[in-house]
């Protein structure tokens, strides 16, 4: 049997198109609606499209700053224990729910506004990496104070719908 000579070079553009890689979170109407249908039962209050877009923008600005954004359950719990002021953003499609089901109770107890976003993948993209993120805590900063106040005020007016 003869040896085969294989060309193992790949075109990078075809790989990224095939994987469906995205570089920014999307809030397109149809896609956002599809993501909202996949959330778990405790994901209340769920951000609407307009609010989600503002939240993604806030996360993007906070991730550029130093120590204004905390990511992950361990870091967010630490910030909540320290009574830090901020906004808590949770992903709505996390399974099992028990991983972070206690966080909304802590946020309500400490009067910290919180909101659910439909997709953990979109939340990770908003931070600036491809890794999904289930929980983010954004602290106020002078760089994005106006946007922070606008989002915090909108979150204070959200209500949890009874099932």
From Swiss-Prot:
UniProt KW keywords: Nucleus, Ribonucleoprotein, Ribosome biogenesis, RNA-binding, rRNA processing
CC per GO annotation: box H/ACA snoRNP complex; sno(s)RNA-containing ribonucleoprotein complex
Entry keyword annotation includes ATP-binding: no
A biological process term (GO) from this entry: snRNA pseudouridine synthesis
Superkingdom of the source species: Eukaryota
Transmembrane segments: none
Location within or outside the cell: Nucleus, Nucleolus
InterPro entries registered for this protein in UniProt: eL8/uL1-like, H/ACA_rnp_Nhp2-like, Ribosomal_eL30-like_sf, Ribosomal_eL8-like_CS, Ribosomal_eL8/eL30/eS12/Gad45, Ribosomal_eL8/Nhp2
Pfam family, one: Ribosomal_L7Ae
Main location group: nucleus
Chain segments carrying region Disordered: 1-27
Entries under PROSITE patterns matching the protein: RIBOSOMAL_L7AE
One of the record's GO molecular function terms: box H/ACA snoRNA binding
Keyword RNA-binding: yes
Family membership noted in the UniProt record: Belongs to the eukaryotic ribosomal protein eL8 family.
Assembly description: Component of the small nucleolar ribonucleoprotein particle containing H/ACA-type snoRNAs (H/ACA snoRNPs).
Function field: Required for ribosome biogenesis. Part of a complex which catalyzes pseudouridylation of rRNA. This involves the isomerization of uridine such that the ribose is subsequently attached to C5, instead of the normal N1. Pseudouridine ('psi') residues may serve to stabilize the conformation of rRNAs.
Entries under PANTHER family matching the protein: RIBOSOMAL PROTEIN L7AE FAMILY MEMBER (PTHR23105)
Protein name: Putative H/ACA ribonucleoprotein complex subunit 2-like protein
Originating species: Caenorhabditis elegans
């Amino acid at each position: 049997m003869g040896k085969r000579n294989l060309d193992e070079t790949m075109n990078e553009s075809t790989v990224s198109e095939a994987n469906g890689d995205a570089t920014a979170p999307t809030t397109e109407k149809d896609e956002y609606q599809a993501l909202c249908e996949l959330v778990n039962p405790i994901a209340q209050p769920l951000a609407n499209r307009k609010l989600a877009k503002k939240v993604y923008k806030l996360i993007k600005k906070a991730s550029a700053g130093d120590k204004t954004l905390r990511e992950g359950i361990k870091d967010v719990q630490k910030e909540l224990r320290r009574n830090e002021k901020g906004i808590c953003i949770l992903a709505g499609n996390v399974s099992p729910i028990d991983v972070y089901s206690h966080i909304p109770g802590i946020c309500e107890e400490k009067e910290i506004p919180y909101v659910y976003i439909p997709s953990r993948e979109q939340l990770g993209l908003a931070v600036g990496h491809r890794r999904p993120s289930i929980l983010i805590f954004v602290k106020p900063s002078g760089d994005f104070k106006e946007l922070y106040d606008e989002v915090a005020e909108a979150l204070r007016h959200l209500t949890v719908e009874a099932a």
